[in-house]
Structure formats: structure tokens, C-alpha cells
Amino acid sequence: MAKPLEELAIYDTPKSGLLYMVTLAAKSSNFRFLEGCVRAYIGHAKTPLLLSSGTEDYFLGTYYFNRGKYYTPVAGLTHLVPNAEFSAYRFHEADPIPFQNGLRLTIRNGEESKGKVYGGPPGPAETEFTSYVWAYEW
């Protein structure tokens, strides 16, 4: 269970490799968590080298997945209960993410800037995240 604005690691390795696929499911009392960005910290970086513009954007969706489920060879939304839960996938076959000396992939439960929470009140609620990450390591 992630608290509001908590950054949660969904994959963490000290090895080198290649990120290939990410699946994520989330369940909450509102969709404000979708304002949170997916971040990739490569090596020993303190700041992310990859930053999505929101959770649904990372999975190639928009506007809180307002168009419903979709399936493409690269990304898709396989389950949706509006304003409550979703599951989605993203393949990085065409845009692989290589990493050396470690990769920490995170999701943040909501987002803020200059003291303001994106999406307005009430902000993100506690959110249950489940993930599966497929990476090749060497």
C-alpha cells in the first residue's frame, strides 16, 4: 500500500541489463495517483534519467484512460474500473532502456510541484500497486 505522494520501487537491481516490459495494476479510492510519474534511476543516479509525464502517459494512454481499454503491440490497458483500478502493460522492444550498474524503476502515488498536489483536492488516496517487470540482466 503506497501512501499519498510516496515513491515506490517496482524494480531494483544492482546489475547491468535491459528493461524490456512493465506491467502495473493499481487500486485506489480515486484516480489521482495517475498524476504520479514513472521514474528510472540508472546506475547510482540521484535524479531520474527517464521521467514519464504521468502514469497513464507511460502506458501510452491519456486523460485518466477516459477512452477505456485498448490493446496495441507496444502498450495496452487490460482492465479498468473508472476512478478505482486499472492494469496496463508497456513493452520496450522498440525503445529498450539499457542500464549499467543498476536500475531502480519507481512509481509515485500522485505528484506535486511547488507545494501543490496535481489533480486538485482531495489528492491521491492510499493506493495498492502490483507490478511485474521483465528485464534482462547480465
What does each of the following model-derived ranges do?
Residues 1-138:
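Beta-strand-centric surfaces of beta-sandwich/beta-rich domains
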